[in-house]
Amino acid sequence: MKLDLTCAPKSICRLAVPVMAALTLLPGGAPAQDAAPLPFVSPIFGDKMVLQRGKPNAIWGWSQPGDQVRVEVGEGSAIATAGADGRWQARFQPPPAGGPYTIKITGKQTVELREVLVGDVWICAGQSNMGFGLGQARNGAEEVKAADHPLLRFYNVGQRSSYSPVDVPRGSWKIVSPTTVGGFGGISATAYFFARKLQESVHVPIGLVQVAVGGVPAETFASAAALRPLKDFDTGIAELERRRHMGGPQYGNYIMHWYDEFDVGSKNGSWADPALDDSSWTKLQIPGKFTELGVGDVPNLTWIRREFTLPDPLPPGMARVYLGSIEKMDTTYINGQQVGASSWVENPRVYFARPGVLKSGRNIITLRVFKLKPDGGFLGKPDELRLTLGDGTVIPLSGEWRGKVAVDARPPHPLPPGFENLPTMPGVLRMGMLSPIAPLSLTGAIWYQGESNTERAHQYRRLLPAMIADWRQLFGQGDFPFYIVGMPAFKHRSEVPVEDSWAEMREAQSFIAKAVPHSCLAVTIDTGDPDNIHPVDKKEGGERLGFCALSEHFGRKVPYSGPDLEKVERLPGAVKLHFGHADGGLVVKGEKLAEFSVAGDDRKWYWAEARLEGNTVIVSSPSVPNPKEVRYAWQANPAATLFNGAGLPASPFRTDNWPAITEGRTSQ
């Protein structure tokens, strides 16, 4: 987009219009960047933004080759010349922290960016748990109501996957307030609690640049150059390059283009409309495989609906929709309003019905489901499908629904070749969402991701460091801080010691935080939900990321880690574990110190007794007379019992180096 479409050259244009409104869209909702003029100023710079304090800032855009562009802010200025491709980039020293300031950019046009603050800028990246909104978090309604922080700003980078580096991001800067943080396009709960904790101590403005896409593995955020040395992603990289050269859709997801072309349920009045007459639709039992619809083994896009009744008055509080596991993708609506969507994962669906969605009396829930496998569809048990109101009242959702196939994959509308690979192909989010915001000046990054890599946890030890190094090279600001949210508890607890990929992912995250310079792990093993991969307790993770930053970057003397295993001492009939980070001493939460297991030379694990002795834990078991190795909290959903006096939990660990169950697993 050109900013002079509504004003003459050399006049002053206001960069306050949301970028999305001016972008031409391809089928699938992807911006036609190649067809549209490039903007004079990149949309990552706008009204209400935060500049990074204490270091040179880059600002860029596009003009005619050879044009000079002058940037002024505070008492500083810089001049840039547009290159052969029209891109100009100026670097300038920011004014002191605070504001507000106005940035004036003068060339063939003049643009003013107003209400600009100077402080600390953080990238907040990952998958759906980083994107999880503040309004959905525990006490979300109250948190949103209290979110009046004019010194906190955020920018949601529009979700986009691409086969080639993108120039122009989608999004706009917003001030944190009750009217901006809730709902679609609102603030990440984890990022919000992180920024609020930081701002309380450092007293400077905080800018959050949110880069989050649900269900994606870490390799989507790394470049091909970073992934090639790992040798695990060669097939995906080759396919990416093949598509780049074959002239396929430049952006987005082949399957979404297929949706948009053939899904009659989304055209001319959505099938999600609660007023739609579905009496002619086929009755079917949910959970089930849609066999009543006669689609057989053919992949299909099916819409299903059912009615449910709610009391008057509705109880207060956030309602949740539980749908069990669904294969393969779904979009869920209540009374015509989208309440959730999941792509390319088969985890249990749990969505939130924000205030105003539900009503007393008749309600309609509608799902659009892309079923890929012959035995796909709804995979859960009947009692997993339910609506839980704010007071705990349960409305069953299993049983009779009505369904209609919008399109199946038989000719003349077969699925496109390779449809299954996006948006999980290597590098597509790095090119689609990170490339257009680099080299934005920043303090560091926070990262909440790993769920989609748990089955390859051992590979993650090499993958995530490669991605971190790639980001540091992309932004060109040295080894900036990179702080990680550890995986919370998930799934149901095992009553016996087990091998577990989630435990191995937590071990990988701990390994990375210690191995990669200027990184830190915020352990959240004391949070989580056995039935929901998207737990509502985001405050703990966000604030613990803040402790990481305060201690490791700002040099404040604050505890940031729970007890950390430092030394293993093998005694006759017992193992003694020595811990660092025992701030205020070791503390037991719960009835007793639990979740320890031991094994001898036979490598068979048994639950153990554990007791505190100063800053050590003594572990033993009558089933293992000569214990050699110890594990703590080694399962997907352990009971966290070991803490320090600062209230921070110990990270799950093991003393053995026996082969992990995820060793050798790759993306291929």
Where are the model-predicted features located?
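Non-catalytic, glycine-rich low-complexity segments
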Residues: Q33-P65, R114-C124, G131, Q285-V295, ...
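Catalytic cores of secreted or luminal carbohydrate-active enzymes
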Residues: P249-I286, M505-A594
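Ser/Thr-rich low-complexity repeats and stalk/linker segments
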Residues: D34, L38, S42-D120, D375
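C-terminal beta-sandwich/jelly-roll accessory domains of carbohydrate-active enzymes
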Residues: S77, K576, D583-Q668
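An acidic-aromatic loop/edge-strand motif
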Residues: V111-P178, V209-E292, L358, R362-L440
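Aromatic-lined ligand-binding clefts that engage carbohydrates, nucleic acids, or primary amines
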Residues: W281, F308-G336, I365-L367
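Short, aromatic- and glycine-rich surface loops/edge beta-strands on solvent-exposed regions
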Residues: G98-K108, T366-L367, K628-W634
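Beta-strand-rich ligand-recognition modules
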Residues: E75-G98, T332-E384
